């Protein structure tokens, strides 16, 4: 498969999921607006860093490389990244193609103080709400 084919397949999968997502966008927006900020934003953290900043990534597999580390503990790895000085942690949440999950994102969010990025394919406003 070529990279374009991987991307086409992944985007098609996410567009289909978005089409079948029946959650109320208004309700999701209300939920987001009621949440308290828990720490610095990604932008605030990066701008506050002196020199180079590292965004560490949690990824179990990739469509092009296959299994990378399927049995990794996302929380343990995020904490190790934070101790090592990572400015932010990027968590893949696509299970089908990358082995990630929303649970990984939530668990990592609870376990570290650095900003967390949800890394996924964003094809719908609900995806932004999920982030």
Predicted features and spans:
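An N-cap/entry alpha-helix motif that binds or orients negatively charged groups
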Residues: 2-69
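Structural preference for beta-strand elements that scaffold enzyme active sites
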Residues: 53-57, 88, 115-117
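Alpha/beta enzyme core
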Residues: 68-92, 110-112, 126-130
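Alpha-helix-loop-beta-strand connector modules within alpha/beta enzyme cores
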Residues: 39-50, 99-123
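Short, glycine/charged-enriched secondary-structure capping and boundary segments
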Residues: 25, 70-71, 103-106, 131
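Glycine-rich beta-to-alpha transition loops that act as phosphate-gripper elements at the mouths
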Residues: 57-61, 68-72, 95-99, 118-128
């Amino acid at each position: 498969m070529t990279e374009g084919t991987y991307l086409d397949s992944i985007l098609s999968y996410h567009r289909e999921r978005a089409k079948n997502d029946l959650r109320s966008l208004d309700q999701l927006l209300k939920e987001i607006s009621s949440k308290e900020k828990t720490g610095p934003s990604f932008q605030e953290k990066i701008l506050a860093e002196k020199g180079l900043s590292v965004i560490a990534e949690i990824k179990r597999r990739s469509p092009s490389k296959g299994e990378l580390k399927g049995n990794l503990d996302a929380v343990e790895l995020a904490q190790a990244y934070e101790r090592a000085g990572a400015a932010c942690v990027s968590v893949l949440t696509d299970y089908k193609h990358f082995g990630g999950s929303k649970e990984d994102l939530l668990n990592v969010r609870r376990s570290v103080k650095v900003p967390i990025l949800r890394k996924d394919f964003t094809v719908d406003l609900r995806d932004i709400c999920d982030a």
